[in-house]
Amino acid sequence: MNHKWNYRPITPEQAETSQTLAQELGISPILGQLLVQRGITKAAAAKKFFRPQLPALHDPFLMKDMDIAVERLNRAMGKKERILIYGDYDVDGTTAVALVYKFIQQFYSNLDYYIPDRYNEGYGISKKGVDYAAETGVGLIIVLDCGIKAVEEITYAKEKGIDFIICDHHVPDDVLPPAVAILNAKRLDNTYPYTHLSGCGVGFKFMQAFAISNGIEFHHLIPLLDIVAVSIASDIVPIMGENRILAYHGLKQLNSNPSIGMKAIIDVCGLSEKEITVSDIVFKIGPRINASGRIQNGKEAVDLLTEKDFSIALEKAGQINQYNETRKDLDKSMTEEANNIVANLEGLADRRSIVLYNEEWHKGVIGIVASRLTEVYYRPAVVLTRTDDMATGSARSVSGFDVYKAIEHCRDLLENFGGHTYAAGLSMKVENVNAFTKRFEEYVSQHILPEQTSAVIEIDAEIDFRDISSKFFSDLKKFNPFGPDNTKPIFCTHHVYDYGTSKVVGRDQEHIKLELVDNKSNNVMNGIAFGQSSHVRYIKTKRSFDICYTIEENTHKRGEVQLQIEDIKPIE
């Protein structure tokens, strides 16, 4: 794959600010530049960025309807009403339900939770779920990570005498559901200063407000932060602002004192002996929690996350791990099938989107397949399967393109849809699939930019190997946790060559272990280039080449720094 290297621009004014900032903080000007690229131009803001503080969290009562939500919850507890915590079946939804249930359960016992079945009920609030609430005497439902578009279902619940508090972060329609309170910073009448909370993050703010109203000290909320961090990392929300504070302290909690359920997941992931990062959550912890809702029922994930006995939690984590193995097998076979279909599509080179429909595909894995297609073909992708008489599916997007708007453009063809800029769910009548495919392609073709459909590596700064000192790496680590809006910095160095010891490694000989010399400084660095063994013949000629890379700690030799090489460009 030929990647285009895109160097992040920096103006003369920004360069000057970078130098000033670096001097004030006692860090490398290169790191000063990284701060400025992230919108941080003052030393005081940089210190808050490097050491996020929990007291800097926003007042939860700044959120529209928060006072109403807290009053209704307090009234329900005072009147001994039965409360149901209801949430989506993905990681964000199940962590949100676990968080709210665990916190309220410390003070109130007439409580239950409910996760809709992906296959029998589908996404969001279902009439079956409302009926369950009515049959079990529920007076108040707190719904998390869904509900913002459930006008019909919440009206149905209201007719049965059930009130709703919505805690959501998805984009609302013009007409809001008739809930008692709607906590969502994406409301048009939003009054909250941060709009990128995860669904679980909104649940946390609700519990923070509930704690304040009842004189419960903040330290009682800290044990919940490991769950919040998992939701933030898994739902791919920006890790800046309030999310950075929550993720930073949540990772500390995850590493030092995880909840019993999280500790069991950490054990089955084989992460007990290492410092857990956002990447570990995204690639190991999150997929296992998600597998429960994909393969069986998301309720099992909540059962695990709320478990108080570690031996039972380990058994439950083992079961969820098995679901993940099943998910991986389905993922592999469906992705292969999808790739074969796309490779044979007529006029693929001229298409700007991919829409696939196969009624045999497993509903729980189609979102993953859509993600794989965007990674390979650099186009927004929609993958659909059949559920009863409907085509239901998931959409994923490429960097910079709003797939939600593209789907919204086709709303008259849809029965239901919802989501974010980069991920959405949708359903339509099977007979509308062809019309949707055409209209979606038309919209994408008109709005996507050429650079959004090609493999691009965004390079933060050009450096020499001599810049990579132990202090530089120590200061660079302060940029953690990495994620959207604060991605792991990618550096490039021009004119490096093989020291003479570089070799191909890996079971299938697909990686290169490198020892490289920087032509400019003559400094030597070790590196690993995954999946790039095709370059080894050129490298062995001792001719110079350019590299772009992230800087990592060698997991096999603690304290040693190595380069994880993203791309190699021979110099012709």
Label each residue range with its predicted role.
Residues 2, 10-140, 160-161, 211-435, ...:
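Hydrophobic helix-and-loop "lid/oligomerization" segment in the mid-to-C-terminal part
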Residues 75, 171-184, 516-521:
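Acidic-glycine-rich active-site phosphate/pyrophosphate-binding loop
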Residues 75-79, 312-318, 322-356, 409-572:
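Mid-to-C-terminal polyanion-binding domains and interfaces
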Residues 99, 175-216, 221-233:
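Short alpha-helices
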Residues 114, 144, 167-169, 183-185, ...:
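Generic beta-sheet signal
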Residues 119-121, 150, 170-175, 189-191, ...:
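Short gly/pro/ser/thr-enriched loop/turn and capping motifs at secondary-structure boundaries
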Residues 150-151, 235:
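Intrinsically disordered, low-complexity regulatory tails of plant transcription factors
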Residues 152-156, 369:
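A short acidic, amphipathic alpha-helical/loop segment
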